[in-house]
């Protein structure tokens, strides 16, 4: 289990992690797993990395990953809440010699999304944020399991389009969306003038992680129809998700109970040297 961090731009600022839970050396048919081989070569240093070898000597890879969720329950102010964090989950990893010249194609995502709400968020000049729309709903993995997600829209025309869809929990909109993953840390510089001598320079790191929609189908899919997705199928998928969340909660409760039990065991008494008390 671990992450493969990919720099998607030449300046190595936008770093997109890809999570691998478990990768086997062979496929189900008994053949060598090419992805396992590539990952092992990276770990063993046979393929260069930016951190170890520098950007010029780092290996180039192409990854066909899938959107997944890292989900767990967290205690916040005495209340247990579900935390769902989007991430790139697994996929096929290929070594390549060349990359597409347009960096905008290096960190893309595509998904069929059932949209249930769109909210406008005003930007904050002091924090360096701009106006955007938050598109909420769900996507589906290869097992057709529900993955609740939200994406951003920063383009003005795009914001107007999604806000105008009128999507709601009673009247969802099913469509294809695509966009780019932003995962970068930049330094904000503040300069204070001095009455004399050197100025005071402060640098503050600012991290931005977002999944930004840059386009969508001209026409949404037909909702609640055979060949698309029906309300009955969605209801069944929602029931399956509740079962899945219950299993996460159970595992977490069992883990907490085992830790509490271990902490409650008194330490073994230390026998004094030269005495034998049975």
What are the residue ranges of the model-derived segments?
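Extended serine/threonine-enriched, polar tracts that run as long, contiguous segments within proteins
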Residues: 121-202
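A cross-kingdom feature that marks long, compositionally biased intrinsically disordered regions
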Residues: 222-278
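OB-fold/S1-family single-stranded nucleic acid-binding modules
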Residues: 54, 59-104, 180-243
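Structural detector for short beta-strands of small beta-barrel domains
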Residues: 1, 7-13, 103-131
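Short nucleic-acid-contacting surface segments enriched for D/E, G, S/T with interspersed K/R
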Residues: 27-64, 156-178
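Short, contiguous, well-structured surface segments enriched in hydrophobic/aromatic residues
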Residues: 1-41
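Short, acidic/hydrophobic/Gly-rich beta-strand patch recurrent on exposed beta strands
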Residues: 3-8, 85-88, 135-141
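Charge/polar-rich, low-complexity and marginally structured segments
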Residues: 92-97, 101-112, 137-140, 153-161
């Amino acid at each position: 289990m671990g992450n493969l961090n990919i720099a998607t731009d030449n300046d190595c600022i936008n770093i997109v992690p890809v999570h691998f839970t478990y990768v086997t050396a062979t496929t189900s048919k008994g053949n060598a797993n090419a992805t396992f081989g590539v990952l092992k070569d990276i770990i063993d240093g046979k393929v260069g990395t930016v951190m170890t070898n520098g950007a010029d000597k780092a290996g180039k890879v192409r990854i066909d990953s899938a959107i997944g969720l890292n989900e767990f329950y967290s205690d916040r102010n005495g209340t247990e809440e579900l935390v769902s964090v989007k991430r790139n989950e697994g996929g096929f990893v290929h070594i390549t010699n060349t990359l597409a010249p347009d960096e905008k194609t290096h960190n893309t995502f595509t998904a069929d999304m059932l949209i249930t709400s769109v909210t406008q968020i005003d930007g904050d000049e002091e924090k360096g944020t701009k106006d955007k729309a938050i598109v909420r709903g769900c996507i589906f993995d290869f097992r057709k399991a529900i993955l609740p997600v939200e994406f951003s829209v920063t383009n003005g025309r795009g914001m107007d389009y999604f806000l105008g869809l009128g999507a709601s929990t009673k009247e969802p909109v099913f469509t294809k969306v695509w966009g780019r993953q932003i995962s970068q840390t930049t330094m904000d510089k503040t300069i204070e003038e001095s009455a004399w001598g050197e100025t005071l320079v402060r640098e503050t790191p600012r991290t931005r992680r977002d999944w930004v929609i840059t386009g969508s189908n001209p026409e949404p899919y037909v909702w609640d129809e055979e060949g698309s997705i029906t309300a009955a199928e969605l209801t069944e998928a929602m029931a399956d998700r509740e079962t899945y969340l219950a299993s996460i909660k159970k595992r977490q409760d069992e883990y907490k109970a085992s830790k509490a039990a271990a902490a409650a065991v008194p330490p073994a008494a230390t026998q004094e040297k030269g005495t034998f008390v049975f």
